[in-house]
């Protein structure tokens, strides 16, 4: 898929919280470069999705329940998709759990589910984690995105699970997957050789992939009403 010539990047998140631009019109930016930040809790920094030139910071009409214009950054792509230099970590095990959480925060990683949970906030809840669940069970019928990801990127998913386990200091880590996702299961089993992460196959029955239902399926524990999984020593991340 070709990169669009122009990208309109809204600065408003969650309805009203606006990020502060870190760039100005005329600036050249690289892919993954931070272009806006917010001091509000629960709002991650924004990064350039490709390389190019900032052409404007002004109001644009965007899809919104309020049906009104919003302040946005207009990025004109240069077509090169050039990235910033990454300071790669040779071995994540050389870092403390706080350093790992900080790197996740700098990477502006957050969940793509409806809640959009910020990953580093989940990791820094201050509550002891006994079990980390990597949720590879599809939450709705006919969804296959997780299965495709695991077929193609099983090694990276397992590595990510190891990093998350180190970051939250979980005693145990499992990957939960629908039992009928045979290709994804095979890819994980080949990757998991000599790996302490457990693979748990669950019945492909809606809504097993939902957070609280999956926790109950795996642990026989129920998350109390008004509480979070962290309150019973469990942390869950989707693939």
Positions of predicted regions on the chain:
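Acidic low-complexity segments
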Residues: 56, 61-118, 122-124, 182-183
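Hydrophobic alpha-helical positions that pack around
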Residues: 171-239
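Short, compositionally biased
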Residues: 43-59
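Short, charged beta-turn/beta-strand-edge "cap" motif at the junction between a beta-strand
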Residues: 34-43, 61, 79
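Short, well-structured beta-strand-loop connectors
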Residues: 24-37, 55-56
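Gly-rich Lys/Arg/Thr-decorated short loops/hinges at beta-loop-alpha junctions or inter-strand turns
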Residues: 81-84, 132-146, 226-227
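Histidine-anchored nucleotide/phosphate-binding helix
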Residues: 151-167
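N-terminal, Lys/Arg-enriched amphipathic/low-complexity engagement segments
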Residues: 1-22, 74
């Amino acid at each position: 898929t070709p990169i669009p010539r122009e990208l309109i990047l809204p600065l408003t998140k969650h309805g009203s919280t606006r990020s502060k631009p870190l760039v100005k019109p005329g600036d050249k930016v690289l892919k993954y470069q931070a272009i806006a930040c917010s001091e509000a809790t629960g709002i991650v920094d924004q990064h350039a999705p490709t390389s190019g030139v900032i052409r404007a910071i002004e109001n644009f009409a965007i899809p919104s329940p309020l049906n009104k214009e919003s302040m946005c950054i207009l990025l004109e792509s240069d077509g090169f998709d050039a990235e910033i230099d990454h300071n790669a970590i040779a071995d994540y095990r050389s870092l403390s759990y706080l350093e790992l959480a900080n790197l996740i925060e700098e990477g502006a990683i957050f969940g793509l589910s409806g809640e959009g949970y910020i990953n580093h906030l989940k990791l820094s809840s201050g509550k002891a984690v006994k079990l980390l669940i990597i949720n590879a069970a599809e939450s709705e019928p006919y969804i296959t995105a997780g299965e495709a990801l695991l077929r193609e990127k099983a090694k990276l998913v397992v590595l990510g699970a190891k990093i998350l386990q180190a970051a939250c200091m979980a005693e145990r880590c499992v990957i939960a997957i629908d039992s009928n996702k045979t290709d994804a299961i095979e890819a994980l089993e080949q990757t998991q050789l000599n790996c302490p992460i457990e693979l748990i196959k669950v019945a492909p029955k809606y809504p097993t992939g939902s957070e609280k239902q999956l926790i109950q399926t795996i642990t026989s524990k129920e998350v109390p009403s008004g509480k979070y999984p962290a309150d019973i020593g469990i942390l869950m991340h989707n693939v």
